[in-house]
């Protein structure tokens, strides 16, 4: 008896720059006048590694399953997932922040606070090594190597390290890697086999970290493909391994990115979210001198996406805004989410608490999504009255397919905008 599985939604995300046009930071005719340059930029970017990577990974996985890179990532993720209860990811830059963005967007909002059973048997995930924050690093060491308590064979005491080569061999990452690998060696009692099994490295072929895994006997050393900009590592093992370990569906993530690639390649300029986003961003700089950009959202699950976006712009030498609090010199793009994934909360009647003190009488029975929609409308009205330059990216929901679309759209738009600036 076969089981028919329901088809998961693949609704497209949308870009709406109407508020930016209304604020006068860029004129619609100016954006329309960029059509030929946008077509030329698209032709260049179509051949780039940032566009080809998701499609290549999916194609190889479909045709060469056991020999494909994605299969190797999923196999390692499964092994780590079954062996430990916490993974420490060491590294900095946009690649690692991309892994964090996928984790926070696609997993339970309080994944690390849940019991292992409530997490579906998936490990906790912690991040370190992006700055010299002594107390943060010591705090994480307290969790994985608690003082005064012997670490036994209990699965809940076991942990592993994913070490990601820092951009330009970042000293912060190198120092953190040395500290945490020393702690890991102590945690396994110096057992070389266990140590090798608990370490995964991800690096370019030219980075010294690439030699660490084979040096300690580990077979889990992944390479960042040649030609992939360090900023755009979220769809390499940097982002995919950690996401798979904590239970995110990385195949759907890549399918979302591939869907955005198709729209980028095939959609007319006027209906192309990548090209329209790049054109508005570029036009705001040319017409109004606004070169700082930020993302803002009412969803805490998208905060790491905003931080990731700031990094992919700043690591190229551009300027990024400070998020929702950025001033009028920043083009703020709101990430507006449609459906919620969990059961809808409703404002209850006051009951024995009394009535009137909290002034919520008119809201009894309203759902959280209804209140969110009203809050977003107020923000839009406030921005319009203040003349703040904004635009919207409309997300049907937050899931792997949507996040794959969003990340790929923003990476492609960054590359296209860079082409426009250089032209």
Model-flagged regions — what are they?
Residues 292-293, 297-411, 415-423:
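C-terminal catalytic subdomain
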Residues 72-85, 142-158, 280-291, 328:
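Glycine-rich phosphate/diphosphate-binding loops that line cofactor/substrate pockets in enzymes
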Residues 55-75, 102-160:
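Glycine-rich oxoanion-binding loops at beta->alpha junctions
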Residues 105-116, 120-121, 183-186, 312-323:
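Short helix-loop-beta junction
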């Amino acid at each position: 008896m076969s089981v028919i599985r329901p088809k998961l939604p693949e609704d497209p995300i949308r870009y709406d720059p109407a508020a930016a046009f209304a604020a006068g930071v860029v004129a619609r005719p100016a954006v329309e006048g960029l059509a030929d340059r946008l077509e030329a930029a698209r032709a260049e970017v179509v051949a780039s590694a940032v566009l080809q990577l998701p499609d290549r990974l999916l194609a190889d996985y479909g045709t060469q399953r056991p020999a494909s890179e994605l299969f190797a990532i999923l196999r390692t993720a499964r092994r780590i997932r079954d062996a430990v209860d916490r993974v420490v990811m060491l590294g900095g830059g946009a690649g690692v922040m991309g892994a964090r963005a996928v984790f926070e967007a696609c997993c339970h909002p309080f994944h690390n606070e849940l019991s292992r059973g409530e997490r579906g048997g998936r490990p906790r995930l912690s991040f370190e090594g992006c700055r010299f924050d002594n107390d943060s690093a010591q705090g994480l060491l307290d969790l994985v190597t608690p003082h005064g308590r012997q670490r036994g064979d209990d699965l809940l005491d076991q942990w592993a390290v994913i070490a990601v080569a820092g951009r330009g061999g970042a000293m912060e990452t190198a120092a953190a890697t040395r500290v945490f690998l020393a702690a890991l060696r102590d945690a396994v009692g110096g057992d070389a086999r266990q140590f090798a099994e608990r370490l995964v490295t991800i690096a370019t072929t030219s980075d010294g970290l690439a030699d660490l895994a084979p040096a300690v006997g580990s077979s889990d050393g992944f390479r960042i493909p040649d030609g992939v900009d360090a900023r755009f590592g979220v769809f390499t093992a940097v982002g995919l391994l950690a996401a798979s370990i904590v239970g995110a569906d990385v195949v759907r993530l890549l399918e979302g990115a591939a869907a955005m690639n198709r729209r980028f390649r095939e959609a007319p300029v006027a209906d192309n979210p990548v090209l329209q986003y790049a054109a508005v961003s570029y036009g705001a700089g040319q017409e109004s001198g606004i070169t700082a950009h930020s993302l803002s959202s009412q969803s805490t699950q998208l905060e790491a996406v905003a931080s990731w976006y700031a990094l992919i712009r700043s690591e190229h030498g551009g300027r990024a805004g400070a998020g929702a609090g950025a001033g009028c010199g920043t083009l703020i793009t709101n990430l507006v989410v449609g459906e919620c994934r969990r059961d809808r909360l409703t404002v209850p009647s006051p009951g024995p608490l009394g009535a009137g003190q909290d002034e919520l009488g008119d809201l009894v029975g309203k759902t959280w999504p209804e209140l969110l929609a009203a809050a977003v409308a107020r923000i839009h009205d406030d921005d319009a009255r203040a003349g703040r330059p904004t635009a919207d990216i409309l997300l049907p929901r937050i899931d792997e397919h949507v996040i794959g679309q969003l990340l790929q759209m923003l990476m492609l738009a960054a590359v296209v905008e860079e082409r426009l600036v250089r032209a």
